[in-house]
Amino acid sequence: MIKRAICLLAVLFSLPAFASELNESIQTDYDEHLGALFDHFHRNPELSTVETETARRMALELSLAGFDVTEGVGGTGVVAMMENGEGPLVMMRADMDGLPVEEKSGLANASRAKQKDPITGNDVFVMHACGHDVHITSLVGTARHMAAHRDEWTGTLMLVVQPAEERVLGARAMRDDEIWERFGKPDYALAFHVASSGTAGVINVQEGSPYAGADTVDIIIHGVGAHGASPHRGKDPIVLGSQIVLALQTLVSRELSPRDPGVVTVGSFHSGTKHNIISDRAHLQLTVRNTSEATRQILLDGIVRIAENMGRVAGLPEDKLPEVIISNESVPPVVNDAPLVRRLRAAWV
């Protein structure tokens, strides 16, 4: 899969040429350099905001390819520029952070890396479980191919290595660090994401919104603690939380049009410390996905309405109703530029 993915960005700006020559060039670079580089990245993932070694290696690779490299943009972000005559400024972006997941694949290049989680402070296993190792390896492959074929294109190429995509922090941090003012605002911006459900070697591109917007939501439930043998003396936050989880399932199925995509997923439910104690608190963690602002508002408003009113049903006073916290870690849907999509399709076909 990595071999095919490396082809993607290199193909985007190749002028008409024999496909076999392009494939042969990419295969050679994969065999001689990129394959080992991918293994290195996969074995050595780093968590969001602390991708220091990954950023350092990416800066080195892009510099060796002939790009002017700036490190530390928006934290650990990297920007690499190559000017090649008159033409548009084209940005290609790849994300580089891993996830706090223990890899159990048993593969030769499996990650056994551990790192201190900047959120919890705990040492956790880290894995490239979302394909970002493919993305950054592909960006290096693109850089090397474009630098070696400068006679086939003109303009300015901006390669962006984005940190903290998984925490929805990196793009904002690079923007706040004035990436556009310092390096120029691109005429075209390109990125891709691998998909395990797709067919290897196939590039999928569509007009409209291929990737949904996302919100991170927390629900804090304030119950009344009691002994497990005397539940009538308390307000059980686990029961209330369970009722909220079930009620949330109606938001997509009964409040959205069947033609309007949306997702409300409860990914975490934490409460209690012991078998025979009814806790006084529960914490739900949700992800909410949408492809339009109208859908987003329906879902977020519905979460607040359900959580608060289920608290009322349970008999909680108004000042103890469940709290709904909508994080600033949110992103809008990706909306592809239709003319650019058509242009790319024509080039690939």
Predicted regions and their residues:
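Structural recognition of the beta-strand scaffold that forms the well-ordered cores
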Residues: 38, 70, 89-93, 128, ...
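Acidic/His- and Gly-rich active-site-bordering loop/insert found
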Residues: 20-128, 133-155
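N-terminal secretory signal peptides that target proteins for export/translocation
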Residues: 1-2
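Metal-dependent amide/peptide-bond hydrolase catalytic core
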Residues: 64, 242-349
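Bacterial N-terminal signal peptides
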Residues: 5-16
